């Protein structure tokens, strides 16, 4: 026991525990199978669209702010626990500090600044990501149903007849989207069967083909319940709501086949509501549309539940 009455426990066990914790963290980091190139993405897949890096940057910034705040809070907690765990005097209750205005102001302003900065960058990026071009390179009507997907390619494909602007199958889509459809777009479609595999890829669900370097507008409609259209490497997903039409645009910039899934619990086979996105060259994409037309998959499948009167009143004419 020291002369001042303090009876501190040795620090060696604490150092041993700290070493064990660091070793466990190192093992956990290496056991994930991630390379050093994966760690900066903080669990996100490699972006495959021109818009995805912006989402990744927002994700990384949010984690950086959270970790900085956590380190500060954890540091203060650990400092208090280790260095003030026992009084060095015989006084059982140390002097209490109350009504410290500078500290209270700091506790109020720091969280307010953090939240305000995160709100600004989130609002800025969301506004840009959700903006729509007047004339996208191509439009795909994504139709969700229990428990698979249909894709209406709204294109003027040789061998197809009709017009997307007057098609009764697409009548449920709001006029503000129909007005941007190409003229005389007879279109082709592709549909999946719940729980089956795509014969071309061996992966579950249908395959949506997209051209590299072209801006694609997804117009999302549902036939039954709420779904969510999520292409994982696009870092973008949007709800598919019956009676309401959502839309967003992306520009794929990497060829390959990528996983897509429904991200909204939609019933007993929700986990099997998968699909694939195959990004190819524009020439291969055009050939694929012609192949669908040769198979007889011309025209469009029903888009789903029409926009309700309430939603039509809420809609504006501005994209």
Swiss-Prot record:
InterPro entries xref list: CcO_II, CcO_II-like_C, Copper_CuA, Cupredoxin, Cyt_c_oxidase_su2, Cyt_c_oxidase_su2_TM_sf
Binding-site residues for Cu cation, renumbered to this chain: 227, 262, 266, 270
GO cellular component annotations of the record: plasma membrane
Enzyme class: translocase
Signal peptide bounds: 1-33
Single GO MF descriptor: copper ion binding
Keyword terms: Cell membrane, Copper, Electron transport, Membrane, Metal-binding, Respiratory chain, Signal, Translocase, Transmembrane, Transmembrane helix, Transport
GO terms classed as biological process: ATP synthesis coupled electron transport
Catalytic reactions on record: 4 Fe(II)-[cytochrome c] + O2 + 8 H(+)(in) = 4 Fe(III)-[cytochrome c] + 2 H2O + 4 H(+)(out)
Cofactor, how bound (note): Binds a copper A center.
Family statement: Belongs to the cytochrome c oxidase subunit 2 family.
UniProt-listed NCBIfam families: CoxB (TIGR02866)
Identification of the protein by name: Probable cytochrome c oxidase subunit 2
Native organism taxonomy: Bacteria, Bacillati, Actinomycetota, Actinomycetes, Kitasatosporales
